[in-house]
Each structure stands twice: as C-alpha cells, then as structure tokens.
A protein has these predicted regions:
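A cross-family phosphate/adenosyl-ligand binding-site feature
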Residues: 2-8, 19-98
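Short, glycine-rich nucleotide/cofactor-binding loops
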Residues: 10-17, 115-116
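Short acidic, Gly/Ser-rich segments with clustered Asp/Glu that frequently serve as metal-coordination loops
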Residues: 14-22, 219, 228
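Hydrophobic/aromatic beta-strand patches that form the interior of the parallel beta-sheet core
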Residues: 35-37, 77, 103, 136-138, ...
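Alpha-helix C-terminal capping segments
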Residues: 90-96, 123-134
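Glycine/threonine-rich flexible loop motifs
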Residues: 110-119
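Glycine-rich phosphate/pyrophosphate-binding loops
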Residues: 129-151
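Electrostatically charged, flexible surface regions
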Residues: 151-278
Length: 278
C-alpha cells in the first residue's frame, strides 16, 4: 500500500513572490507535498477578511515553482483575493485531499501583541484552525524585502515536524514570532539554533496604536490620508508576554484560540439582566 506524504498548505499576506514564503517552502519541503496558494500582491492588514462581492481567480505559477525549487512536490498558485480567500480557494479547488497542516508566513514583520488581530498571515492560520487543521503562523520582526530568514530554519523545521507528528488542541493554533537578531543576542547555554536566547511560550501583550492617520494635501486641491501609526507596549515589564520575549531576544510562541468568549466577564454581564429578565 502506498503511504501518502503529508500535505502542507502554505500561504501568507505578503504575496506569493515574497522572500519569506519562498524560504519557508524550501525549509519544510522534505516534510511532505506542498501547495502554496498566496495573494497576487501584498495583502497585509486584511486579518480574516474574505471576498463576498468580488469574483476570485486562481493562476498556476509554473515558472515560480521551477525557480523556487526543482521539486515536483511543490505547487504554487496565486489568488487575487485576501489571505483567507487563498486558504478557502485552496481547500475547495486545489488540494487533492485535506491538508495535514496549514502554515502562514514567513511574515515580513512581527505579528505579536494586538498586531495579531490585524494580520493576514494570522488570518491564514485562524482559517486553517477553524477547519480543524493544525495551523501555525511564523513571523520575523523585520519588514525588509530582503530580510534574513535563515536563522529561523532550525526552529521552523522542529515545530513543523512536531505539529505533523502530534497535532494541536482543537480550536488552537500557534502564533510564532522571531526577534530580529542583534549582536547582543548571542547564543546562550541551552538556547535554540540561529542565535536566539531560547523559546518562551507566552501570552499576547496589551498594546495600542496611536497617531494612526497622517493627513496630506494633493497639489490638485484635495486632502488624502495615509494609515501610519506608532505602536506602544502598554506593559513593557511583563515578562510573560510576547513583546517582552521578542525585545529580549527570545522566540515568542503564543497559543491562540478561535473561541473569543471572555469567560471571566460572563458572570458580571449576567448580573445586568437578573432583576428584569430572570
């Protein structure tokens, strides 16, 4: 009986030609058959949005496949929609069977703290998780097009193998963020490969974005705006958070769940209605 190799579905929000997704495919190519379905262009900030009023198209990128890897086990497709559209389209139209794992990334820029809520790469991962497929997002704190992803290789390979072997709890995916290495972050005894101090499983930090809009004036007489903003970590000294881990040279792994219910607030909110609605 033929033993089928695992099937990995990979997407991102930086576009199918981004360096991060190309290197991710190369890093995990020996773990199974790979289908890439990613946006035609950058779709950062699209979170879990999907296209309800726009027709979608898929394009097989044969030349990219041969340029990316000389492997017949890799298919690369682009979609004109959002990152979540890419996952939905791949599951409905491309994948020959249910994927064993969905991977988002590698994202150019971190998705820690509240940034995870805006991230299209996290949208990919949450969509996979909602389909009960073990899903992981990988991001690097470096927005440059030519970012160096090589230091991420050992841990990405280790985590991919672990998730393929053991799966993840139902309704839980992983948000994995790598710090940008600096000379002061030298490897420590017991640290992980790539020069990181180690790995911390941590919670999402509370943070806020301010000064988010910049107004400009066009020479033709009308105003326009750019979304920019400045992020502030509201708890910089909290050592159990993803931002603290990244700021101190650790890889931050945040288990993230589909269930958004604030269970700790249910009793308090229920009290509002006891007198008139009991």
């Amino acid at each position: 009986m033929e033993i089928k190799r695992p099937l990995l579905l990979i997407s991102n929000d930086d576009g199918y030609q981004a360096k991060g997704i190309r290197q991710l495919v190369e890093m995990v190519s020996d773990y199974g058959d790979i289908i890439v379905c990613a946006p035609e262009d950058a779709r950062s900030g699209f979170s879990c949005a999907f296209s309800a009023t726009t027709p979608l198209r898929l394009i097989r990128r044969e030349t990219l496949t041969s340029h990316l890897l000389p492997l017949t086990s890799v298919q690369v497709w682009s979609c004109n929609g959002t990152p979540v559209d890419c996952v939905k389209m791949a599951l409905a139209e491309i994948c020959p069977r249910r994927p064993d794992m969905v991977i988002g990334g590698i994202n150019h820029g971190d998705n820690a703290s509240v940034n995870a809520h805006y991230s299209g790469t996290m949208g990919v991962t949450l969509e996979g998780c909602m389909k009960y497929i073990p899903s992981v997002a990988f991001s690097l704190c470096d927005h440059r097009d030519d970012a160096d992803f090589e230091p991420l290789r050992p841990l990405i390979r280790e985590m991919t193998a672990k998730v393929l072997a053991d799966g993840l709890p139902k309704g839980v995916c992983l948000n994995v963020n790598f710090p940008l290495l600096h000379t002061e972050f030298s490897p420590l005894e017991g640290g992980v490969g790539g020069g990181y101090k180690g790995v911390k499983v941590c919670r999402m930090a509370y943070g806020t974005w301010g000064s988010e809009v910049t107004k400009c004036h066009h020479p033709r007489g009308y105003d326009y705006w750019w979304m920019v903003g400045h992020y502030t970590n509201d708890e910089p000294d909290a050592e159990d958070t993803d931002r603290w881990a990244l700021d101190h040279g650790y890889v931050a792994i945040t288990p993230t769940q589909i269930d958004l219910t604030a269970y700790s607030a249910m009793s308090q909110i229920s009290e509002w209605f006891k007198s008139n609605h009991s």
